[in-house]
Amino acid sequence: ASLHEVCPEHADPAERADRIRGEQFAERLRDDLRQERWLYDFMLAYHSDVRDSARAATAALEGRTPLSNHDLLVQAYRATQYREGARRRATYDELVSTGSLGLIADQRMLGAAAQLYRIRTIDNLVLESLQSPYRREFRMSVDSDVQRQLARACGDRYIRPGDYAGMGEVLGFPCKIELPPAAIDAAAEGLRSNPALLRALRLRLADLETRMVDFTGNNREVFQALHEVTGDPP
């Protein structure tokens, strides 16, 4: 061996400690990125279903596509929905705040994390959904009992974080509202006769489609890098 080569067990104690800390940080960061990858994949799948409902409700209210009163209520309700997700960035923030980024040997993973935590796609999506005029208009227009039945029969199903198989079953499943036909017809007629609701729904649809472009187009390289450094899902 070269005189300049030092075996790990004979390395300077400070260097050895840094190497161990770097490995620990790297494992934590990779786990955070796996969780972030699942969240991004889930948010894309979930809000694609919300967008599809917004499209269907818009087409029905504009008179372009026939939709029964029952199905109009379901699609219009689901167009109001959104999901948040707990971000996993504590490890990266700790690396930055303590000046420890240099401890991470895997520069590709570090680069993917830096890109990921800069973009605000999820934050923008959640904020727009919370402040959506359509969500407010729908909730003011539809009878409370009808809304409760919609939430019970057609609202979100639980999904465990990290569950890839269940992503498509959280919102886009078939459902049936258990209400008298007269109540369904009255609620649907309230939607059909409300021009302010349709205008707000068009804005909601435009916002959703913009964010879907962010997920699948504008940020494609970021998500591709995230997939590469985290490997295949379990």
Feature locations, PLM:
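Long, hydrophobic alpha-helical segments that serve as membrane-spanning/inserting helices
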Residues: V6-P234
